[in-house]
């Protein structure tokens, strides 16, 4: 027997074909959400308060300090928040201290700071009753970046940018004349030496002393001449910078100094964030820049005078590691003192080394490091600016390297906690202005923190973020996998990110650093491709927001691959060589081969085993969760795998789903972490279990009650239904399944079913990927799903009186009220179809002025029907089903309703949808199709043992699409069904062809895994053997019931008066320009005329046509389409004098053209009568003529006789 058994949870064993030992379990799959929010509550929120506070008034006599905060219990439980359309949030109380510096008085007070949305255990938020997710954002990291560009003459120029988290950008660039310029905040450029002089190093000698003598420096110094001898060089530089930043304003050195301090050195205006300081220190640090360079002068220990490194030594990694403590200490540190007129007058500490130029061994190049400022320094320092300039100058000498902005070392993730912190900071900074003004205006003696703090800006910022930010999304709740994928999504869009239109191919493309961090496969098709990604299965965020992936450390001395796990970011990984997870190992953990496949800085090739530093932990660390659920992924083309991963997220939860026979082993973990199942929180024993709740008694005697949700409506209108898995007496451990969620079976993800599938054509019904299906799948409810829709009706106070929910509805027969209760609300369990009343409601309507007598009669007889109109809630067009639940909210019961609303009724209608022609089906390999025919079971082809096939697919759908995984799955699935087992074939480590054939043989199938099929209609065998097996097929959310639509009389667009479009608007079908051409081509003038008039926007024409049809009268001639009037008005609005004239050149009002249509009536009967009349008249005339002729002839004869 190939493979080995693996237990997944307590309910499922699978035969696994994996050969690679898993040394690390998958992390919790939603930790990116939960960990980030926890960090925000633990210290993120505190940091934001500390950033903005303390706040002083303008005279600096009062100061408001932050002391601490406390989050109280949420007002509603999760379930209550859902029912009441409320948010699941907790009140937050902040303690402030107000200090009067003149009197020394201190007032401490706790201030209510609004309700803050709290994340649920599932990583979601409930906002206004709807479950939402904050998608993590992928943004460019703050730091310093260097780039190169080639000009039209082929000359390479360099550029650099310091990008802060917030604040002004500082750029450097060189031109074709080798002069280096700087730009501050995208303004006009100035020579970089001007900025150096403004920083207090004004002499040319000082500049050469700092940067060394290079062509770029020399050219720039020559360009930057002293123009005004009255000013010092520093003052002149300051004024020049001020002129660039504030053109047209009077320039002084003092104002320029304060402007530059505010732009770069004020922590309130300029913030690198922890990550920016980390990236700058990493980039400008001398350790990374000295690597593999030849030192030009000996390195001497400043304390002992000992020579650490001789001149001419190549600084290899081992040499640098040997003097690392000195490099981090005071080695080669030089203190430069700026002059007194400088922007910042503190001494500047730099680390300076001289190395041999890589391009010219006779030249010496100076490398300046920023001497590693402390992590707490969140602004840029003069040392950073000088070190950046040094790196820039070094690039032209061949030292250092330019950055790739798509490298994941330069892109970081802002998860929910950071996005929220930014929002709170925004609100607090708006509040700050307000507080300052109140402190200055009001009397200091009586002021308290409560009086000067207005929390509205903060609560508004948070509310706006959750309600309308691009990153706050309604949770995709089609099935548990789509929930999980949504929580792990990474978006490059959103505020501070990219926009769809400006994102090029490079940003969207797969980058080598995505390996183990972002999935190369799972991304949407369409305009967002590559901008929205998914975290890989083992991906994890470090404290700076960079994605890390785990590797097994290789002991370089012994060559043993240890079980020690090291998490590396993309930057760190670039320094090492990493072997693939499927490299063969010996028993002792050493590599079996001398040469192994590995990666180093994106180069995939064979490397000697003795230079490998790390090894992948698992083959599935490359891909995301949905992709890791595709068996035989390695046999599929990536485009189809992308479709397969995306379509699993669109699977509809079925009534009784089955886990796949052929899985990947990922199904258990995905179901467990998705948040849709009920998981035991503690160890214990089940003491009570039914469909609604499970009670577990813990060992310490306390009781846990788990509530099971039955048929709740999910965000996407599917039934969210949980099923109890445990029985009384079962012992459960923490983390065990207590109940399956939707689309789960026995603790595993179960998106579809395991039908018997044959690859064969049948009467042409599976042309173009169509699917032929057996009636068994309909009859046995194999692909039946339940859908829930919510309808609501509210009564409001109107000017004419309150609306009322009642059973007494004007002009409605008793038959329509049979299922309403005495209040006028539908009963639970009633079957309803479109147009049925769900909630009877009447609204007062405006009265005509009645005479006194009429009013008296009204008052006496209470004739209600004339003063109210029917505004009942009815089942909308195209819907039907059974009433599942009714919820009533009233002010009397203490429910919170919007102002003006007295009562709110919600009706839930459940609809059972069997599979039908037009529904979309798919496998897991991107093989999708539409059901084209449902064939009776007796007509379906059958196997030699008499089993009829369930589904027939077109064999032509496989070769050109190159998703061969489906064929492998088919054969292995048939073997699993025959053997009565479930199989796990993990991605990139699954069943080999030998495993596949040995399992097929074990199941007693034929050696080609094909079989003879018999035609169900004739009983004859088909000519050729057919591939038949079991394939996992899912029903997708694109169902024909949601798409089929027909319009009778419906709404029209206000301006053009043409019918609206789309099913939601009960719209019509668009008869467009090309369709008009078709009718013109055939000369179908009458059809064309009515399509362009009655059926579209001829207002009078269509009214009269409707009237004529209902009364059985002839249809009048059409009038002028409204769109012609719109065109005329539009031309007139452009100032063109356009008028319509008749034959006599008299102007005709457009409205007049429709007048007198009734005279030109065409009536078929009249035509017949007219014809008959004309024929009779013609006949009479003919007879009269004949008679006249006869008379004349007779007269002539008589005359002749008389003669």
UniProtKB/Swiss-Prot annotation:
It catalyses: RNA(n) + a ribonucleoside 5'-triphosphate = RNA(n+1) + diphosphate. The keyword Transferase applies. GO terms for molecular function: DNA binding; DNA-directed RNA polymerase activity; ribonucleoside binding. Pfam families: RNA_pol_Rpb2_1, RNA_pol_Rpb2_2, RNA_pol_Rpb2_3, RNA_pol_Rpb2_45, RNA_pol_Rpb2_6, RNA_pol_Rpb2_7. Residues 1174-1195 have a biased composition (Basic and acidic residues). CDD domains: RNA_pol_B_RPB2 (cd00653). Its EC number is 2.7.7.6. SUPFAM superfamilies: beta and beta-prime subunits of DNA dependent RNA-polymerase. Residues 1174-1203 are annotated as: Disordered. Keywords: DNA-directed RNA polymerase, Nucleotidyltransferase, Transcription, Transferase. One of its GO terms (cellular component) is DNA-directed RNA polymerase complex. GO terms for biological process: DNA-templated transcription. The keyword Coiled coil does not apply. It is an enzyme of class 2 (transferase). It comes from the Bacteria. PROSITE patterns: RNA_POL_BETA (PS01166). HAMAP family: RNApol_bact_RpoB. Belongs to the RNA polymerase beta chain family. PANTHER family: DNA-DIRECTED RNA POLYMERASE I SUBUNIT 2 (PTHR20856). The RNAP catalytic core consists of 2 alpha, 1 beta, 1 beta' and 1 omega subunit. When a sigma factor is associated with the core the holoenzyme is formed, which can initiate transcription. DNA-dependent RNA polymerase catalyzes the transcription of DNA into RNA using the four ribonucleoside triphosphates as substrates. This is DNA-directed RNA polymerase subunit beta. It comes from Streptococcus pneumoniae serotype 2 (strain D39 / NCTC 7466).
